[in-house]
Amino acid sequence: MVRPYTRKDYIRKIPASKIVQYDMGNLSGEFPLEVTLAVKEHTHLSHNSLEAARIAANRYLQRTTGKLGYRLKIRTYPHHIVRENPMATGAGADRVQSGMRGAFGKAVSSEALVRANQKIITAYVQVKDFEKAKVALNRAAMKLPVTCKLVIDKGHDLVQF
């Protein structure tokens, strides 16, 4: 795993994170069941993929359980700043660019560095909506560039998994 590049004091222009919300649904409700999406291996998750996973899970849960029937929480934050040294291609590119001289690059994106078995997204639902939460988190897992697993954090005695 790489060392995170997070010192924002040294970076002039930081790209904004596309993740709009970290807590969605009924924030004040009590839910007996917590189903969590966890990654199986070390990886980098871009803010774009985290936002796509959030949208997929939130939209499905909102459609199937209603606006007050769930709570969804994003549990990682993209702190790591990704830099890129843009290389010119085509005719005459060697005159325009300086190659690897001054190759530190510009900040282009942000990523979350996640470890194996780290929890990414948690859905809080009623027992009757357990299958819907599983489908929603599986849809979110399809948007991530890593294999994921479902973990029941709370209420595992209430459902068969």
Curated annotation (Swiss-Prot):
The keyword Ribosomal protein applies. It comes from the Archaea. Keywords: Ribonucleoprotein, Ribosomal protein. Gene3D superfamilies: Ribosomal protein L10e/L16 (3.90.1170.10). The keyword Thylakoid does not apply. Belongs to the universal ribosomal protein uL16 family. PANTHER family: 60S RIBOSOMAL PROTEIN L10. This is Large ribosomal subunit protein uL16. It comes from Methanosphaera stadtmanae (strain ATCC 43021 / DSM 3091 / JCM 11832 / MCB-3). The gene is rpl10e.
